[in-house]
């Protein structure tokens, strides 16, 4: 029964020291940026009832969820998504809208073994609830761009898509559910040959404007020229409105000077079925992995109560950390500047001195050793160059200069004893 006691479950790992500190810093910088832009914080439980994720459209595969039973035999899951629990809160609580919220937490999904994906990831995100207005999408994109800038993430782009356009095409061509799942993979993977064969096998009329748009969809990525091309083939007002929405968002963000951070991809289709309109994905060129995802989900909150429009974006913290590690010098955690060695009867004095010295921005720690030589050895091993000894009647400062030498000796009052 102890076979796995030294191992981590598949898709999980331990984060140590420098990397753990970097994850925390990324989360805090994201949080600070979002709060400065007027977002309110919200937290939901790490565990949720299975029913929260099991509504009709089943946006998350049951096989992807970690399930177990509570004390009453009810099915509980580790949350596989942050947006759906937030929708539960918005649908069951009375909140004034429009409302901007931010969150951060761990998400758990059982990915296939050897797929190269982690089953536990950290997400920080934002949601704009209660307003169906292009300003909400613009606000989300601006917030994420500014947060990535403050993190000094290099070479990133936010792609803007429109799942409503794809849904209009599927509806107009009467493509049923099972066929649609296959079609979706062809378009998402930009598999032009497979898409062409699909159109042939379905005996769709290639002269029809909607079929032409379907066949071109995977190729419609780039700048505003993509919009112009799509508009020519749009065969309904609903399609035209969907395309115009993307155009308005792109133009507004471009005018702010953020044009180099955005692009259009009308062939992008999110795998989560609860998205109803504009969708987003963000990438960093160096790692080629998704760092941002989200979109508009106007029907999701209605599964839990009042129907409320909403749009949001999630930032994949682990991928941001990976990118920062690759594009910057190796991150080094702040080392201890001063170590205080003390006799037990001088603990109060040592702690007062520690509090005094850290006010100057120094990192100060109390020694865990009872023997001064052990403290010296630990200090050398960890590149600590200053040790202060709190003796019975005095304080002694030692500095490493090829050996430990006394730098200063003074009174026991840490008010009068000052280091360099």
UniProtKB/Swiss-Prot annotation:
Gene name for this UniProt entry: hisZ
Designated name of the protein: ATP phosphoribosyltransferase regulatory subunit
Subunit structure: Heteromultimer composed of HisG and HisZ subunits.
Organism: Bacillus cereus (strain ZK / E33L)
InterPro entries the UniProt entry points to: aa-tRNA-synth_II (IPR006195), aa-tRNA-synth_II/BPL/LPL (IPR045864), HisRS-like_core (IPR041715), HisRS/HisZ (IPR004516), HisZ (IPR004517)
GO cellular component terms, semicolon-separated: cytoplasm
Protein purpose: Required for the first step of histidine biosynthesis. May allow the feedback regulation of ATP phosphoribosyltransferase activity by histidine.
Subcellular location field: Cytoplasm
Keyword Lyase recorded: no
GO BP field: histidyl-tRNA aminoacylation; L-histidine biosynthetic process
Domain of life of the native organism: Bacteria
Additional notes on this entry: This function is generally fulfilled by the C-terminal part of HisG, which is missing in some bacteria such as this one.
Pathway per the UniProt entry: Amino-acid biosynthesis; L-histidine biosynthesis; L-histidine from 5-phospho-alpha-D-ribose 1-diphosphate: step 1/9
Family named by the database record: Belongs to the class-II aminoacyl-tRNA synthetase family. HisZ subfamily.
CDD domains: HisRS-like_core
Molecular function per GO: catalytic activity, acting on a protein; histidine-tRNA ligase activity; transferase activity
PROSITE patterns per record: AA_TRNA_LIGASE_II
UniProt keyword annotations, A-Z: Amino-acid biosynthesis, Cytoplasm, Histidine biosynthesis
UniProt KW Cytoplasm keyword: yes
